[in-house]
Amino acid sequence: MNAANPYLPFPARLVEACFDTPDKSLRTLRVAFEDPETAARFVYRPGQFAELSLAGKGESPIGIASSPTEGTHLLFTVSRVGLVTSALHALSPGDRLGVRGPLGNGYPLPDLAGKNIVIVAGGYAVTTLRSAMVWLLDPANRKKYGLITFIYGARSPELLLYPDVWRGWMGRDDVDCRVTIDNACQGWDCLVGFVPRVLKDVAPASEGSAALVCGPPAMIRFSLPVFEDLGWQPEQIFMSLENRMKCGIGICGRCNVGNRYVCKHGPVFSKAELDRLPAEY
Amino acid sequence: MNAYARRIREIAQRLLAEKRVDAVLGYRAGTVPMRARPFVARTPAEAGELTWTGFCVGNLARLAAGLGGRLAVCAQGCVSRNLVGIVRENRLRREDLTVIAVPCLGMLDARKIVTRMSGRAVTGVREEGDEVTVTGADFEEVFGRGDVKRDNCLTCLHRNPVLADEVVADPVPETGGGDIDKLIELWERKKPEARFELFTRTFRDCIRCYACRDACPLCHCATCFVNRSNPQWLGKTQDEPDVLTYHLLRAFHCAGRCTDCGACESACPAGIPMRRLTSKLESDARRLFGHEAFLSLDAKPALAVFSPDDPDEVFS
Amino acid sequence: MDEALIFSRLDVPRILTAWGAGRAVYIPETAGAQTAFALFNPERGLSLHFGNTTLSPKSFLFPQTECLLRFATRGPEAGLCQTEPLGAQKRLLFGVRPCDAAAFALLDRVFVQDDRSTDPFWALRRERTLLVGLACNSPDETCFCTAMDGGPHNTAGLDILACDLGDEVLLRPVTDRGRALLAEAAQAATGVPARGERGGAALGQAETRRMGAEAVMARSPFVPGLTLEAVSRRSQRTVHALGIWPRIAETCLNCGVCTFTCPTCHCFDIQDETKGGSGRRVRNWDTCMSWLFTAHASGHNPRPTKVERVRQRFMHKFKYMPMNLGGRPGCVGCGRCVRQCPANIDIREVLRAMDMACRIAPPSSLIPDEAVS
C-alpha cells in the first residue's frame, strides 16, 4: 500500500499470460513489480485482492491467486466482463500496468492453526483458494494444520483452472484432493458429480475444523446445508464476497454489505458475520 | 383550490371504495411551507389526505409508470399530456389508467415568493381566488397570483387536461395569457457565439444531480445514456464540456416530446432556469413541425414520423 | 488568545480582511433564493442574516471533481501514475453553521480512518482550511440538529464560534488554531475579553439565544421524541427487513439532490480520462441513488430497484454509520434534504417511521436480536 497516497498504484509489468479456458473468458496474468523494493515490501495474505490499474482505462479488483510463498511475482486470474478486464485481456508481455494493494482482510489462516481445513471451490471462484492451498501446503505451514481437504468442481474438464497445481496435490498423502466435473466425460480420470454431492461424500467432521467456501450461488446454496447437517457452526465457515468497488480502502462508500465494507472488512467473512448482515449481495 | 381538493378526495374515495383502481396518485400537504408532496393513496381513508394547492408542482406522470396496477392520477393539462406520452411509449396501458382531470389555473413558484421575502421565513401561504397571502412569524403580505406564478404556467397553452376519465371542475380558459414565443426571442435574437455564451452561463451552477432528468416523465429509458460505461458517452466531472453535453443530449432526447411542464426547473436545487431549453424545444416543435406533444393518444409524435416536406432546419 | 472576545459588529469586515492575509476568505452570500459561499469582498460587505447555504460547504474539503493522479499515455512514461499535487492555498470559511461543522468532524473520521485508509487529499485540505462558525439564533423550520447529537451553538469541528449578539459579535476560540486566529483578530480590531460584568452579560446573551434556538426546534412538530434509540437497539437485519421501505420509496425520484446537498454524504466514483498524450484519474461525487452505483460488470446488481437504494441511504445514515462511529448519527440535522427534495421526502418522517417500526417489530427469527422491548 502506498503510504503517502493510497490511490497511487505500484508500477508493474506483465511477465506472461495464458488463457485458462477454451472460450478465452478467463486469463491468468503473471505480474512483476517494476521496483524490486516494492516487490520485497508487498506482503500479502491468501484471500486478499489488489486493484489492477490500467492508466486511461480504470481499475478492477481482482483476487490474488498466487501464494506469498511463491516468490515476488503475483498471479491474477481475470474474467473478461467489462472495459478494464477486456483491456487486461489485451495486454502483451512487457506491458505496464499498476497494482494497488494488498487490499482486504484475507483468510484468517493464522487463527485457524491446529485445525483441519476444508476448502470447497466451484468454477472460477477458486482463484484465491489456490493462494490459500499453496500457502497451506508450503512446508513452513503444513505442519501447523491438521487434515487438509480440497474439493473443487467445474462444469467440464476444460473449465477447471490450475491443473498444473492440483494434479500435483493428487499424488500427495498430506492432502485429500477431490476434483470433480458435473457430468461424465470421456477421458476424465477424476470424480463426477456436483460439488455439494462430493462434499457430502467426504463428510468432513466439524470438530476442530474450518472451511473456506467460494463458488457460484447455486453451489453455495447446496453446500451450506451439507455443513449444517454435519454439525458445523457458522463461525467455522468462511466465504469471500465480491462487490462493485472503487477506492478499495473503505472510504468511497460503495461496496458495503450492511455496515461492513467488502473491500476493507472483507472480502472474507465468516458465515456467522454474514448472518448478521442484510443479504444484499 | 379548496373546492378542487374536496372534489379530488370525493372522486378518489369513490374509485377506491368501488375498487375501480388500486391506487390514486395525487398530492398531500408538504412537510414544509410552500410544498405539496406526491402521494399514493390506496384506501378511502388515505384518500382523505389528498389535496390540491398552487404548489402541486413536478409531474406525476413521472411516477405513474413505475407504480403498477390500476392507477388513477390527478392531472392538470401538462401532466395529462405526459400521461398520453407514457401510454404511447408503452410504459403504461390506457386501460390501467384513470385520469382525474384537474383544469389548472397555474402553479406558484416558491422561489419567487422566497426572493420577495428578502430572507424573512415563510410559515404559510393562503390562496384565495386571485390573491396569494404569504405569512411569516411577524408579517403578512398579499400578492396577485400572477406575480408569483411559475413562468411556464404564465405561458401555458393547454391548461385543460387532454384526457379525462373523472373531472374535478369546469374547464378554464385554455391559455395562461402569456406569450410563450416571447421567451424564444431570448435565443432567436442572438448570434451563435452569444447563444453558446447564454447556454454556458445558464448551466454554470449545475451540480449533475440529475434531478431534472429524474423529475421528467419523458426520461424513462431502462438505462440512461449517462449510466452507460461501455462505451461511456460523456465524462462525469464538473468540467464544462461534460456538464453542457449532458444537458444538450438530454434536450435532444426530449425534443418533440417535451410539454414544457417545468418539472425540471422546479426540481433543480441550484435554481437553474431549465425552461430556457424546454421552452425552445416546445416552440421549435410547433414552428418546424406544427406539432404539440401528446395532445391526443392518436397523434403521432413529430420526430417519429418522416414526411418528405419536413423542414431541413434542425432543433437549434 | 484563550478566552472569548467581544467585538463590535461593525468591525467584522475589518477582521475578515485581516484574516485574509495569506488566506482566501469565504462568506455566505445570498442571491435570490440561493445562498452560497463566495470569496469575501470588503467592498460588498457581508450579512449575518442568512439561513444556510443551498449546498453544504463540504466541497471545500471534498471538491465535486478532484484529480487524484496524472499519467502520460504515450512514450516511455506511459501508464506511470503521479499524485496530483495540491495547491498551497490556505482558506478560511466564515459563517459555517454548527451542523455543517459537525459534519466536517464526522467526515474526518470517514476520510482518515487508520494507516491504510487515509485520504491525503482531504487531510491536506482540512489542515489548510480554518473554520469560523456562526451560531444559529433562529433555526429554520426544517432544522433538527438537536435530535442528531448537535446543537445550534455547538462547537464540534470549528476553530472559532461566532455568535451574533446584535450590535456585538462574540468570538469564542475552540482549537489552538482558533486561539491563534483570534489573536490575529485582536490585532485588527478592539476586542473586549468576555469576562467580568461586561463579559458575563455578553455570555449570558449568547446563552439566551442558544436556549431560544433550541426552543424553536423543540416546538417543531418533528423534533420532540425524534431519536435513534430503537433503531440502534435492533439488529441491522431487522431494520433492513422492516416493511416501511416500499412505501417510503414509492414517491422518491432516485435523483441525487439529497446526496449532493448533504454535508455528510461522501460517496465518490473514480474515473480515468485521457486526451491525446496525457490522462488523469479523477474522482467525482457519486450517489447511492443511482442504479450504476452498485452494478457489477457481470450485470448483477445487489440493489436493482429504487426500494433497495432508498433503504440504503437511510440505513447508512441511521444504522451503519452509528454502528461504525460509536453511536454518532450519520445525519447532522441541517435540513437541506428536507428543503430541496423534489418529492418532499422528509428524513425526519422516515426516521420516525423507522423508530416506530423498530419498537414493534418482532425479534428476528434468524439471529437473536440485541434487545427487544
Stretches found by the model and what they are:
Chain C
Residues 1-236:
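Iron-sulfur-associated redox domains of electron-transfer enzymes in respiratory
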Residues 104, 263-267, 342:
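Active-site-flanking alpha-helical
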Residues 225-250, 268-373:
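Ferredoxin-type iron-sulfur electron-transfer modules in oxidoreductases and energy-metabolism complexes
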Residues 248-259:
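Extended amphipathic alpha-helical segments enriched in small hydrophobics
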Residues 257-273:
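A donor-sugar binding/catalytic signature common to diverse glycosyltransferases
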